[in-house]
Amino acid sequence: MSTYQRPNIQRMQGYSWGEQPKDGQAIKLNTNENPYPPSPHVAAALNDFATTELRTYPQPTADALRERIAHLHGLSRNQVVITHAGDEALRLAVTTYVSPGGTFASTNPSYSLYPVLAQIQDAQPFNVDLESNWTIPADFATQASAANAQLTCVVNPHAPSGHLTRAEQLHRIAEEISGVLLIDEAYADFIDPEIGYTSRELVEQHDNVLVLRTFSKGYSLAGLRLGYLLGNQSLITPIIDKTRDSYNIDAISQRLGIAALEDQTYAQSTWARVREQRQLLAQQLSELGWTCVASETNFLLSTPPNDSTAAA
């Protein structure tokens, strides 16, 4: 039977999403969703949304939402592009900055969508193994540059470990690589604020850094599919003007995104509760003999004791 697929599409395996239990009894943890509901401001904005607005196309570049996000991060609107969740942000970065036949580098293990996006682009995924303690190897940038990576991705905090790479190391990587560094901060809202981590200076000081954020985890809006990229205007403008889909963010998502950002008190209270429960769970697992990686996310990577039967 003949196929009309491009050869690289025919060869590749697609992305496998997490299992979606339907019995209504399973406690769903496999996609790291926020256990708390969205802000009441989001519910109110949805209730007040006039369906007559759906007759016309939404504001093409979601400027009001871009302004809110820029203010939140201490940046300008020209340094922000809104995307259809973090996954579209990744796709746009690959489409814009990785040539067919080029290389997309990341750490291993990492988000399983990365190699899929590379293969769709007919590019080569290139993996650099993390150290045994989940840290990024000192020669990571050297290896990525030797592979001629046009786009290099670091998940921070990392999934599946929860380990946080300090901004100082990310500055060094940005300086040493030859292409674009994309920092995937899908879980950054759960970082302990006392650590003082921020990627704003990375965006301000390097013209080759993109930072990915999403509303899915921290703002409990995984079902809405809303995210964004931060970066130097020279990186953001081609995405907005050339590779982004037309009207990629619908009117409802723009309105609800603004509502979520307006209620920082609620958002930060849920993040604090997640951190409290994370610490409590790690302590309880430790008392049972489990080993947990220090996490700055909303999940824990835990290893059972050798005698797991006894621990149970």
Regions picked out by a protein language model, each given a short descriptive name:
Residues 63-103, 121:
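Phosphate-binding glycine-rich loop
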Residues 132-191:
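Active-site phosphate-binding strand-loop segment of PLP-dependent enzymes
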Residues 96-154:
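PLP-dependent aminotransferase-like
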Residues 279, 286-291, 299-312:
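Conserved C-terminal alpha-helix-loop-beta "cap" of PLP-dependent enzymes
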Residues 1-56, 148:
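N-terminal "arm"/small-domain region of PLP-dependent enzymes with the aminotransferase-like
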Residues 102, 123, 177-180, 184-185, ...:
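A short helix->loop->beta-strand "cap" motif at the edges of active sites that frequently abuts
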